[in-house]
From Swiss-Prot:
Descriptive protein name: Nucleotide-binding protein VIBHAR_03667
SUPFAM superfamilies: P-loop containing nucleoside triphosphate hydrolases
Keywords: ATP-binding, GTP-binding, Nucleotide-binding
Residues reported in the UniProt entry to bind ATP: G8, H9, S10, G11, A12, G13, K14, S15
Domain of life, per lineage: Bacteria
Positions that bind GTP: D56, I57, R58, N59
InterPro entries on file: P-loop_NTPase, RapZ-like, RapZ-like_N, RapZ_C
Pfam families noted in UniProt: PapZ_C (PF22740), RapZ-like_N (PF03668)
Function recorded in the entry: Displays ATPase and GTPase activities.
Record organism: Vibrio campbellii (strain ATCC BAA-1116)
Key word Nucleotide-binding present: yes
Single GO MF descriptor: GTP binding
C-alpha cells in the first residue's frame, strides 16, 4: 500500500490534488485529523489499495513534532510521500477574493485579516514544507495545469522516473520558489527592442529566427543542455522524483520562453518525462 499525505497552504490546491489522486485510483480522505492518521492507515492496510489523505491547517497539531513522529512511524512501515501544495501570497489573495471564502485561521480568530492569516499559516507550515517529499507551487496555474502537474509528479514517482520540469519566468515578477537550478539569460540579445517582434512571444517563429542568428544564444542553449545531461545520471541515482530548471529573462516573454521550450523539447525527444511551463505568459494571459 502506498500513502500520500497532502498538505499545504489553504487555497493552494489541496482539493485539486486529492481529486487527481482519486482519478488515479487512490482511496481519498479529506481533512483527516492527525491523531487519527495512524489508526486509519492500519484499518485500510489489508486492502492493498493506495491511500491519500489531506491534512488541513486546523488539523495539524500545535507541536509539529507530533505530526513528524507519526509520519516517521508510517514511513518505517509503508511507502509514504508527503505532497505539499505551495503558492505565493498574491495568488492566495486572488483566489480567496474570487471565491469569497474565509481563511480557516480567520474562522478560529476573527481578529485576523486575510493577509495576516496567510502569513501565519506560512509560518506554521514552514517546518512541514521543509520535510516534504514533493513541493508543488501552484502560483498562477489554472486548475487544469495544476491537475496535470500533480498527475505527472505522482505517476513519475510511482514509476521511480525523474520528471524534468522546465519553466520560464520573468525576473520582474520574482524568482520561482521551486527551482533546483536557475539560469539568468538577461545578457542575451533582446527581441523586445525590435518593434515588429515586441508583441510576439518566444513560442513564435520570428522570435526563434531572431535569436538563432546570434551565436551566444546557440552556445548558451548547448551549454545548459550539456550541464543537465552531465549531471542527470547522478540526480537520478539520488532517488529524486523531479528536477525543476528555471530560465529567466526580464519579462519572461521572449528569450527565456524560447530557450525553455527548446531545451525542454530536447530532453523530451530523448525519452525523458518532461513538463514545460511558461509562468509569466500564463500570468499575462490571466491579466
Amino acid at each position: 500500500m502506498r500513502l500520500i499525505v497532502v498538505s499545504g497552504h489553504s487555497g493552494a490546491g489541496k482539493s485539486v490534488a486529492l481529486r487527481v489522486l482519486e482519478d488515479l485510483g487512490y482511496y481519498c480522505v479529506d481533512n483527516l485529523p492527525v491523531n487519527l492518521l495512524d489508526a486509519f492507515v492500519q484499518s485500510v492496510s489489508e486492502s492493498k489499495q493506495n491511500v491519500a489523505v489531506s491534512i488541513d491547517i486546523r488539523n495539524i497539531p500545535k507541536k509539529l513534532k507530533e505530526l513528524n513522529t507519526t509520519l516517521e512511524k508510517l514511513k518505517a512501515e509503508l511507502d509514504v510521500t508527503v505532497l505539499f501544495l505551495d503558492a505565493n501570497k498574491e495568488t492566495l489573495l486572488t483566489r480567496y477574493s474570487e471565491t469569497r471564502r474565509i481563511h480557516p485561521l480567520s474562522l478560529d480568530s476573527q481578529s485576523l485579516s486575510l493577509d495576516q492569516a496567510i502569513e501565519l499559516e506560512q509560518e506554521i507550515l514552514m517546518p512541514l514544507k521543509a520535510h516534504a517529499d514533493l513541493v508543488l507551487n501552484s502560483s498562477g496555474q489554472s486548475l487544469h495545469d495544476l491537475s496535470e502537474t500533480v498527475r505527472m509528479r505522482v505517476e513519475g514517482r510511482e514509476r521511480k522516473d525523474l520528471v524534468m520540469v522546465f519553466e520560464s519566468f520573468g525576473f520582474k515578477y520574482g524568482l520561482p520558489s521551486d527551482a533546483d537550478y536557475v539560469f539568468d539569460v538577461r545578457f542575451l540579445p533582446n527581441p523586445h527592442w525590435e518593434p515588429a517582434l515586441r508583441p510576439l512571444t518566444g513560442l513564435d517563429g520570428p522570435i526563434g529566427a531572431f535569436l538563432e542568428q546570434h551565436q551566444s544564444v546557440l552556445d548558451l542553449k548547448y551549454q545548459i543542455e550539456s550541464f543537465i545531461e552531465t549531471w542527470l545520471p547522478l540526480l537520478e541515482k539520488n532517488n529524486r522524483s523531479y528536477l525543476t530548471v528555471a530560465i529567466g529573462c526580464t519579462g519572461g516573454k521572449h528569450r527565456s520562453v524560447y530557450l525553455t521550450q527548446k531545451i525542454g523539447e530536447f530532453f523530451a525527444d530523448k525519452g525523458h518525462q518532461v513538463q514545460i511551463r511558461h509562468t509569466s505568459l500564463e500570468k499575462n494571459v490571466k491579466e
